Structure formats: structure tokens, C-alpha cells
Amino acid sequence: MFIAATTVAAFTLGACGSDAASAEGSVMRIGVTQGVPTDLLTVVAENEGFFDKRGVNVELNPPALTNAVAAAVISNDLTVGSMVPAMLWPAIEKGACVKALGSLVGNTMDVIAQPGTEIAGDPADPDTTMASIKGKTIGVTARGAGMELWISQMAQEAGMDPAKDITFVGVGAPATAIAAFKAKQVDVLYYGPTMASQLSESEFVRVTDIIGKPGNALSGLNHGYPTASCSTIAERPNDVMNYCKAMWDTYDFSQDPQNAAVMGKWMAELTGVAPEAGTAAWEALKEAYLPMTITKESWEEQAPLAGSPAPTVPDFASSVYEPCAGGDPR
């Protein structure tokens, strides 16, 4: 399976790498994946001075691939990197000593279909609409990746069998995905607000409208945990806690309506869209961003969204860094 393969690679790489964990007060190398909104709060924390205010010396490092973050955190080439449960959990199971420091963002994805597709039901309730795409081809970033799991989960909750009733097609990142959709190479596509400037509402029909909304299969999704190795946490406790405090500061900043323009600016920078598109994307996504807290319940809730079949949930107490994720440490 794709997810398992990337995680095995990450764990294997953990045997080598630099000793980034060793020096308290030295540069913290933090992974930031460009082109997607996951690491927005990290970008804001650096560029709006929240890391500086907490005395954290940070260098943002964009990895080439999302799965490269897992390898880099485990090997200490990155001090902190955001990892989805589908990569974090298998790494822990295979013996990697890493801990989740907090939460970043929930679901940022909707599902759309070609113009003219008959969609029955309410897009805010996927249980009523997903059956309308039975028999369709669905474009996802890559086969076996998290996006396929999440759409499959919505299909299952709507009474479908994803293995039989829908066909997934890997179409890549937004630019190539949109091109494939416009060329009608797929019937259905993943969709997020950062894609709006390239694919307007008039060019599709909505299957779902659930970003930042409760009561659906993806309401509890955590799209990324900022994660550090156990050696980093043990050897740089002050740096790690100041990083955590800065991220809590940034979340508070993001939730103040007076800062919407700033959030839109950095959304545009991170995702590579025009400034006005960044502002619109922030407005659409702001409810999806999460405080750093991780609860045992929310941790266990990731299981059906982390693999198929659902993986074993790692022990919460030993896999989550409670001083940061247990509540506001400031």
C-alpha cells in the first residue's frame, strides 16, 4: 500500500541523518510543505515574529514531498515537521520514537463533479449526496494517499462500497488535477478553496460543502500533527516548549478578525495563488484551523481516516507530548 511504503522508507532513513536534536538554542529546522494550506500557522508564526518573541531561532525548510517530512523528522534532519496519522502511526509502530506536539488543521477538502452531474441531497451532508457519484471516476492526488481514504470514508458512510462503486485516479497536485478535470479525464475531483482562482464555481457542481463544518465523516480529521523526535524533546525542552507557545500565540492571532488580511497574505504566499485568492481561501478555511490541543478522543478518532483497514491506534500517552498538546502552556 502507498502509505505503508512511504512510512517504511521514512523509518529506514531514520537510521542515518544529522544530529539536529542536540543543541538547545540552536536553529530549529521546521518543515513546511508548499502549495497546500496545512502549514499556514507555521509560516505566519515565522513571518509575523511569534517565534522571535518566544526566543526560538527558526529556519523554514520546504521538503520536496510530504512523505519526506516523516523521514526528516525521524532522522533529525528536521526539528519539527507536520505528519498525518497515516505516516506518523506506522512509524511509531515500527519503532520510531517521535511525538505529536499538537494539532494544525482539520479537513480542507471538498468533492466536486463535472457540470451537469445530477447531485441529489444537501452538499453539507455527504451522507445524502455521495451516492450520486456511484460509478464515477474520482481524481485524487495519488492512489493510496490520505485523500483516497477520506473520500472512501464518506462513501462508506453513505452506504457505498468504495472498492466496487467508485474508481480512483491519481491526478496529482491542484494544477494538474484541474487540467485533468477540465479535460474530462475524471468525473469527480477533490477541491479546496485555494483552487478557486483556477476553477470557479460555475465550472463544477458541488458534491460536498463540509470544510469547517460539524456532523460529517471528516469533521474530526486532523490533517497534520507537528511532530518531533524523542531526542529533540529530551535534549531541547526549552526550545520545544517555546515553539509550542509561539504556535499557540499564532493560533490566537489567526482567530482575530482584525488579522484576516495578514492571514490571507500568507495563505497566498504559501499556496502560490494571487493575493485576492489567498484572502478568499483564508475566509473559506479559517474555521478548519485548530488549536494545538490533542485529546485522547480526537487521537483515536483518526483511525478510520489513517488507513484501510484502520491501523492500530498508538498509545496516546507515549505518542503525544502532553506539556504542549495537553492544553495552553503559556
Model-derived regions: residue spans:
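Pocket-lining segment of extracytoplasmic ligand-binding domains
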Residues: 176-267
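Short, solvent-exposed loop/beta-turn-alpha elements that line the ligand-binding surface or hinge
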Residues: 53, 120-124, 212-219, 286-296
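Conserved C-terminal helix/tail region of periplasmic/extracytoplasmic solute-binding proteins
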Residues: 303-330
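Short, glycine-/small- and polar/acidic-enriched structural segments
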Residues: 23-163, 168-171, 187-193, 209-210
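C-terminal motif of bacterial Sec signal peptides marking the signal peptidase cleavage site
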Residues: 11-15
